[in-house]
Amino acid sequence: MRDFQRLTQALADILVGSPVPQAREVRLVLAAARVLHGERSDTVALDFKLQRRGLQALADRIRAEDLGGLVPYADQITPEMLAKRRQGIAQMLLGALAERRFEGLINDVTGGGVLRIEDHRPSRTDTDYRLLNGNGNPICRFNVKFHGSLFREARRHVGLPPEDCFPLATYKINQALRRQEQEKLPYVFLVLSVPDLSATDVGRPIPDDYVWALAVLRGRMVVEEAIVARLLRDDHLPLFRPLFNRMPEGQFRVISAKKADRLLREMLFERVHALSLKGFTRKFRNAEVDMHFSLTQELTPARTFLELLVQESPQRFAVRLYIGDY
């Protein structure tokens, strides 16, 4: 049962000190491991809220077939699948590191009093944070974007230097504006730009067993989130600290959904490269149709944004966000 033991050991390390996720696949692995170690199936089934008969049958299959008794496709995992899972973990880890930097910036600018942020990441929606005033009333919502990979041909195709070019999917701009209109709360994209820091760079130190376990469990979001949380703990964090140190607050910039939409309409054919390519969707099947913005000219530094907010009345500032001044 070498492969099944590898999976249980990886999960045990990922989940050390954390509650067991509610994902059924994870509970089945951990429960079967306990039965295979000699515990009574009825007791274990009760602990994991599983059917005793089904759990015992699963343990018997694993004993006979190793990991194939749990996931018949386990021997079909390819290097391409592993690379995809590693990339997904890395992208989520980059987002988590960016959010930590932003929390520090907010506290630095406001002293933790005039403004505060409300964490909405656990809700898994398009809102990462809401910015609240001193009375707890929302001023705007933030959607955090990490930008590292450069568009090398940006100058030729959209008229911007590669290091100053930020792509944002056009459908995300549309969704953000619709959300703003529905809830009457300004929607703001918070962008952390670190040129030439890509998910590939971040993915290299991720333990192979973590990546493999995620692939075996079909990329379950709760497992991916647990891996990221584990990598941010003290024993793993030193591996990623050099990357974390490349995220100075000066690289944080913001753009409201309204301003992004206005610029999209004004420069549709100049900045949406996909519209100038015949058969774009056929040539780049999984590519998004992006609008490209100038980081330095069209986005506002986050520190400037927060300082202006502290100086102005929150109500007036919210109106300016709503109409696209920033």
Residue ranges and their predicted role:
Residues 1-104:
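Interdomain/boundary linker segments immediately adjacent to catalytic/signaling cores
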Residues 3, 11-22, 27, 45-54, ...:
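Non-catalytic C-terminal interaction segments of nucleic acid-processing enzymes
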Residues 102, 106, 127-156:
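Conserved catalytic cores of phosphodiester-cleaving nucleases, focusing on short active-site segments
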Residues 81-128, 133:
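Short N-terminal edge-element motif at the start of the domain
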Residues 90, 94-100, 105, 169-174, ...:
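Extended low-polarity, hydrophobic cluster-rich segments
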Residues 145-200:
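Catalytic cores of nucleic-acid endonucleases
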Residues 107-111, 189-192, 316:
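Extended amphipathic secondary-structure runs
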Residues 116-122, 138, 149-151, 176-179, ...:
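Polyanion-binding and phosphate-handling cores
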